[in-house]
Structure formats: C-alpha cells, structure tokens
Curated annotation (Swiss-Prot):
Keyword vocabulary terms for this entry: Disulfide bond, Protease inhibitor, Secreted, Serine protease inhibitor, Signal
Highest taxon in the source lineage: Eukaryota
Positions bearing the site annotation: Reactive bond: 36-37
Positions of the Kazal-like domain: 18-74
Principal location class: secreted
GO biological process terms held by the UniProt record: inflammatory response; negative regulation of cytokine production involved in inflammatory response
Stated name of the protein: Serine protease inhibitor Kazal-type 7
SUPFAM superfamilies: Kazal-type serine protease inhibitors (SSF100895)
Organism encoding this protein: Rattus norvegicus
Keyword Isomerase appears in the UniProt entry: no
Molecular function terms, GO-annotated: serine-type endopeptidase inhibitor activity
Gene: Spink7
Cystines in this chain: 21-56, 34-53, 42-74
Amino acid sequence: MKLLGGLLLLFTATCLCNVDCDIYKKYPVVAIPCPIENIPVCGSDYITYGNKCKLCTEILRSNGKIQFLHEGHC
C-alpha cells in the first residue's frame, strides 16, 4: 500500500512539473495570444510569469532553456 501511495505521489508531482506549450508553437513567438489572467507561475530563471501562456512564450523564445518550476510566485 505504501508503494502505491509513493507511486501516486511521484506521478502527481511529475504531472505538475510540466507545462504543455505545444498549442502555442503554431504562432510566431512575438504574436502568441495570451489571456489576461493572473495565475502566476515560476520559471527556472526564477522569474514569476503572469500565467502559463506567458511562461510558454519565454520557453519557446529561449528554445527550451527556461522550464516550469512550480505554480505561484518564485
């Protein structure tokens, strides 16, 4: 039972540590239409982005050098 709980926790943590930016790849980086919503996320450059779309813009602009760290402010 502990093994199952540990695997579930690992799976959940893995899923939360990724942002799917594939939907934004069809736009030029300078023209990605991000919604006006304030749901902050922290990037691996330790900058707080206003939402996942704005982080994806930077991820694509940096060719993947910046990554998602966690939800909320850095």
